[in-house]
Every structure is written in structure tokens, then in C-alpha cells.
């Protein structure tokens, strides 16, 4: 049984070849690439030597298989990745601008993942789990809200630490149910991995120093503030460690 587990989307990414390409005109694309934020996280954790597993649903198609095979090759347990008979694996089409911004078209809201609900999650799978990782972008429908809302008290009762990367779009916070869940996750998180603006947005404070103190006073043990090309900052045990980008 894995020690690090995540739940969420497994998808393929298909990328525009040219900068400033749009979806309104015919253009060349490359892919498919295995993707999905929680899948990328758990894959990297496995490559670093972690005992990892993922819970998800993919379609009975090659888009699902390219992901499943990649995860298995890198050491992720995929026994809890279910295969849908009726829905296809999610797809993200992506084009890039000169500014570095991206435009997306997602098919996730009608993909195989919508078949996952709390009743399908095998609680015995968490027998040896020490860390559970949540990506905010995975909270996209009522099923995922139900899953995380029920998992949080279950995880805490088992002494499993919760790692939270908010990684969400601002419009998510306009949905009262999603906002409530995100704040609930943050209140129960042991490890928090925000970007600089996410840190301030979610704490409601205006300085990083105040936000860090606030979170630490509420029991968040480890905070990693991501700064893109400028690296990251680790806050732990009252100490600050600035880390350069690789």
C-alpha cells in the first residue's frame, strides 16, 4: 500500500506548435502528452523514490493508457485508477502567447473522471498512507467536492498528513461550495504549497510575513511559497530557506 496518495484528474495535453496560435484558426498541434496536475505530482514523487498511488478514472482509450503506462513506468501504483466503459479520458488543448500566458480548452467536465465519487474510493487503500496530496484544480464539480469533503475527516482520523497546492483559477472562488471546501482544506493542511499571490488571496492578508505567521499559528507545519523562475521559499520550524530555481 502506498505512503503518498492523490486523487484527481489524469488527462492528455495537446499543445499548439506556434506562439500566439489561436483556437479560432487551423494550426498545428503536438502531443498527446501525459498530464493532469495531480498525475504530474504523484509521478514526480515516485521518481524521487516515494511509495505512491493515485485514485482516478480514465477512459478505455489510448489517451488513458499513455498516462497509465507512464505512471506505472515511474513507479506509481495504478490499481485504483478505474477505467470507464462510456466516457473518454480528459483532454486539455493549450496554446501559448509571447507573454507566457496560455489559453486552454478542457474536456474534463464530461470526461471519465466525472464517474468518480466517494463511494468508489477504497478506504483500505489508505492503510499505510502517510501523506495525501490535494490539487485545488481538481475541485471542479460536485463529485470532487463530495470526495474531498468526506476524505478530510477520514484522513485526519487516521493521522494522515494533508498536503495542499491550491493551483486554482480565481473564478473557482466565486462558487460558494468550492470556496468553502478550499478554506476547509487549508484549515486542515499540514503542508501548503501556494504561489505568492495565492498565499495572500487565501489568507486575506497583504504581506507574506503576516500570512506565514497566520498559517503557522493555525497549525500548518511546512509552507513552500512558489516564485516561478525565482525559485521558492521554504518556511519550517520558524526558519526560512530561499531555494533557487533549477
Question: Each predicted region: which residue ranges?
Answer:
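Conserved phosphate-binding/catalytic region of the ribokinase-like
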Residues: 1-5, 154, 208-246
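Structural detector of well-ordered beta-strand residues that form the stable sheet scaffold
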Residues: 5, 53, 162-163, 224
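Conserved beta-alpha-beta core of the PfkB/ribokinase-like small-molecule kinase fold
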Residues: 131, 137-214, 230-232
